């Protein structure tokens, strides 16, 4: 007999407490495949699970890529690093493809409220962005375009339907600006987008919802930190910008 939804959700929560994010993601994937629209709690569990699963591979990929570049001159070591990087890349691509399939097949079509639609389109932009980080050539052009389209669609809905202080709208602006800075190498556009989102939120601080006050102000701080980083001469290639974690 297949597990019920409640049991799967409880198993995901247990896995989260044990920091076993692969198990957490597997449970939430099954919940999603049951086909019903996810509650806010379920949506956040899914997001946190996959953010951690993919985050571990993104981090590994960066470390191995750096080692690979530093082993020039030692062909054997460089080949070993290259093969290991390709192994991690395959894992990362498979995870991203998993999430994108869930988004296209279940989550985006079932999203009723604007908030849910923006959340999932932002997520789609994020996972195409992660693919862009490890892609090259025509492959990269394709995933970059899909990432930008997803972010832009989410951004248009958010501007029309959500308060500038809403944490999901702010989180979208944060990640979309990181996309411009890191993927498109467009620092001016990244700064403009981040500054506009920050200024719009500041202008409407009185609309801050008590429940999301902490989330909203945290993301505003991250926007400001990125702006400081991006506009300073100290910004270096190996300094990572802030982006939202799962659950925002």
From Swiss-Prot:
It is found in: Cytoplasm; Nucleus. The keyword DNA damage does not apply. Belongs to the 14-3-3 family. GO terms for cellular component: cytoplasm; nucleus. GO terms for molecular function: DNA-binding transcription factor binding. SMART domains: 14_3_3. One of its GO terms (biological process) is negative regulation of gene expression. Interacts with daf-16. Interacts with sir-2.1. Interacts with hcf-1. Required for extension of lifespan by sir-2.1. Required to modulate lifespan, in concert with hcf-1, acting redundantly with 14-3-3-like protein par-5. Promotes nuclear export of yap-1. Negatively regulates the transcriptional activity of daf-16 by sequestering it to the cytoplasm. This is 14-3-3-like protein 2. Keywords: Cytoplasm, Nucleus. PROSITE patterns: 1433_1, 1433_2. The record marks 240-241 as: Cleavage.
